[in-house]
Amino acid sequence: MKDILKLSIAEMHENLIKKEFSAVELTQTHIDAINNEQLNAFITKTPEVALDAARKADHILIHEQDKITPLTGIPVGIKDLFCTKNIKTTACSNILRNFTPQYDSTVVKRLIDDGAVMLGKLNMDEFAMGSSNSNSCFGPVENPWTRADGVKVVPGGSSGGSSAAVAGFLCAGALGSDTGGSVRQPAAFCGIVGLKPTYGRCSRLGMIAFASSLDQAGVLTRTVKDAALMLQPICGYDTQDSTSANITTPRFLDSITNIIKGKRIGIPKEYELSDKYKEYEEVSEMWLKGIKYLENEGAEIVNISLPHTSYALPVYYIICSAEASSNLARYDGIKYGTRVNSDNINEMYELTRGNNLGTEVKRRILIGAYALSSGYYDAYYNKAQCIRRLVTNDFVESFKSVDYILTPTAPKEAFAMDEQLDTLTMYLNDVFTVPASLAGLPAISIPIGLSKNKLPLSLQIIGNYYDEGGILNIASVIEKHTGNILK
């Protein structure tokens, strides 16, 4: 048997059933790996909680076999954006450094109720704002991959801790959140699978809000099958979340048939950037490779146009910043947030927010407050919402003639940890993921190969609303051709 840490969730489950090892042994092996990790992926470790859950899993595996699920005894990590009862939840911000929730978020509760073993909380960009996991009060996360010349690279963001932990074999799968690409982009940088479901498919109760009309929980795993297994329990209607969709959750694993003959795959011309920018050539070559894989399996390739794509990124940053400025207004040191005391209340507000919020978070709050101000609301926020509808309509029209859309996930490979990118260049990392987020569509990132620098490159499959099973199946076909690049 190969290294226990490198098994997939499905393989771990199979071995637990066969009693090749116990859930406690599996969990302890992961705890040992976490204690020796150099990636800075885990910021809060919960070994006692994990071992207690593992013992319960072993009891079920031996004495209550009718209660066994595919996640029984499987060690997972939780992005520090999701509330965990009696366990610190900080959003990697100094302003929440001492916050301990009294309840579990719905998706965390559903994972635990399904038998998963929580190993701890994972590093992230502060309040999920970032594409490199360098905006964290706990310090940056390192990608398990290194460039061919030995240079360390970023894991992507904002779910950088989640992607690094899964790619670094510190947990079997991880919970992340995706607002504009925060599951898919780090999955691409780390060479793993990252799935963002349809907006409303998973409850947002207990997920610290960044941009409420965009935020959605997602999963990061090492295989497509594992993504289906981990996504299954966290989906479903939640009466306590007004944005939760009251729709039946299918069995996602049943959709992975690897049969795609006759499926129409849309290739949007607006995502082809190599004719303008030479640095995108490698990504375009991998995109063509993915197209060939699907074509050889019987899929029909259709050229499509998403004409408002070029507006998606600026629209996204206006909307998400506006919503962030509203959501983060509550952290003032009075009811929420770590207070910096002062005799003057205005000074107390200023010191509390000025000292405890990071540079990127403050930048977006300022952008958002400006966009929502009375003199500029119509010119910026209102106009952005109108263009968001046009971006959404592009997808709606395209899905009348195609079943799925195939694009790159990120325009380039992971960049160096010490590379100082300007803000605009950093934002461009989400150029391919943001459109699906604005439309609320499900999308998955799947590794396609390695760059000349021996770093992962990935493709994104976008599906129609609530067709997570379909995008998992397309991703599985690509995975069949590429194999697991982590090997």
UniProtKB/Swiss-Prot annotation:
Keyword Protein biosynthesis: yes
GO cellular component labels: glutamyl-tRNA(Gln) amidotransferase complex
Enzyme Commission numbers on file: 6.3.5.7
Reactions accelerated catalytically: L-glutamyl-tRNA(Gln) + L-glutamine + ATP + H2O = L-glutaminyl-tRNA(Gln) + L-glutamate + ADP + phosphate + H(+)
Intrachain S-S bonds: none
Signal peptide (residue range): none
UniProt keyword list: ATP-binding, Ligase, Nucleotide-binding, Protein biosynthesis
Entry GO MF terms: ATP binding; glutaminyl-tRNA synthase (glutamine-hydrolyzing) activity
InterPro entries attached to this UniProt entry: Amidase, Amidase_CS, Amidase_dom, AS_sf, GatA
HAMAP family, per database record: GatA (MF_00120)
PANTHER family in the record: GLUTAMYL-TRNA(GLN) AMIDOTRANSFERASE SUBUNIT A, TRANSAMIDASE
Job description of the protein: Allows the formation of correctly charged Gln-tRNA(Gln) through the transamidation of misacylated Glu-tRNA(Gln) in organisms which lack glutaminyl-tRNA synthetase. The reaction takes place in the presence of glutamine and ATP through an activated gamma-phospho-Glu-tRNA(Gln).
Membership in a protein family: Belongs to the amidase family. GatA subfamily.
Name assigned to this protein: Glutamyl-tRNA(Gln) amidotransferase subunit A
